[in-house]
Amino acid sequence: MSHRDTLFSAPIARLGDWTFDERVAEVFPDMIQRSVPGYSNIISMIGMLAERFVQPGTQVYDLGCSLGAATLSVRRNIHHDNCKIIAIDNSPAMIERCRRHIDAYKAPTPVDVIEGDIRDIAIENASMVVLNFTLQFLEPSERQALLDKIYQGLNPGGALVLSEKFSFEDAKVGELLFNMHHDFKRANGYSELEISQKRSMLENVMLTDSVETHKARLHKAGFEHSELWFQCFNFGSLVALKAEDAA
């Protein structure tokens, strides 16, 4: 059962850096719905993309799976035999709950839920990889290597879904969308104190990039095609495609 997010409703004397600990995991479904505009749409559309891209006898990777929302959406839309989903996250609290969520919904496609570092896992025989609001928590210097590894592990014709919070090269646009996002959180019941305290905890661990930076990295990794397929304010999702004739 998900609880309402009130983690930052009272003043916190010493704000540390953000961690996906037990307290966050307990309220995460409510937190992300009230904080990330378009999150439900992204999750459901990931399932539609899976229906199009997942091939028989291949694997799907959900890197930074949190509670397994994207994994479940993918699994509901796999209609082939001999597929497997590998869901990985480095938060013990998230993984514990993810396993419970996955086990609560029976389906033919098996899911391996792994507590580990996405930088260490091998990507093999993949028809689809999901990075759903995960890359932004890696050090910027480590992001290209992960995308390179994903590209190498994708089969020809495979797809990467990359969802992120964005920064903007146009400062005026960035300011507008930043303020619209805060309006969104206020409309969902967050106070100014809650918004401010959470932002202070996240600012050193969640480092955002522009869409242009993401596309440049994807191109450098080898992806022949990439495009923004969803955006709401400063949140969105790209899809990157490996050519069907890629070596």
From Swiss-Prot:
Its EC number is 2.1.3.-. Keywords: S-adenosyl-L-methionine, Transferase. GO terms for molecular function: carboxyl- or carbamoyltransferase activity; S-adenosyl-L-methionine binding. It catalyses: prephenate + S-adenosyl-L-methionine = carboxy-S-adenosyl-L-methionine + 3-phenylpyruvate + H2O. Gene3D superfamilies: Vaccinia Virus protein VP39 (3.40.50.150). CDD domains: AdoMet_MTases (cd02440). Transmembrane segments: none annotated. S-adenosyl-L-methionine binds at Y39, G64, C65, S66, D89, N90, D117, I118, N132, R199. It holds the Pfam family Methyltransf_25. GO terms for biological process: tRNA wobble uridine modification. The keyword S-adenosyl-L-methionine applies. It is an enzyme of class 2 (transferase). Homodimer. Catalyzes the conversion of S-adenosyl-L-methionine (SAM) to carboxy-S-adenosyl-L-methionine (Cx-SAM). PANTHER family: CARBOXY-S-ADENOSYL-L-METHIONINE SYNTHASE (PTHR43861:SF2), TRANS-ACONITATE 2-METHYLTRANSFERASE-RELATED (PTHR43861). This is Carboxy-S-adenosyl-L-methionine synthase.
